[in-house]
């Protein structure tokens, strides 16, 4: 997917992968994984290893930042999974380098509490 997307997602990218469940659930997991904080290791050892190997493979493509060449095509690969039945849907979501993440809590009195 990353090879086919080429420079369209403005590398360096974050790759989110959702495996299993229904396809709409796999797609949602992939999008959620894009927002997982950098450096957060997957608690599942098999998935942590898969993330590491995929990141190395993607970076070996040589696209580099903004397609100028180099070994940083992706900054992170994050994977999640769900139980599945007779078929195994897989969804991949790509996000550009300017990934933004924040959160907020809206209180009854109208105040907003922001946090990362």
Regions found by a protein language model. Name each.
Residues 1-116:
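Non-transmembrane, aqueous-exposed alpha-helical and coiled segments at domain scale
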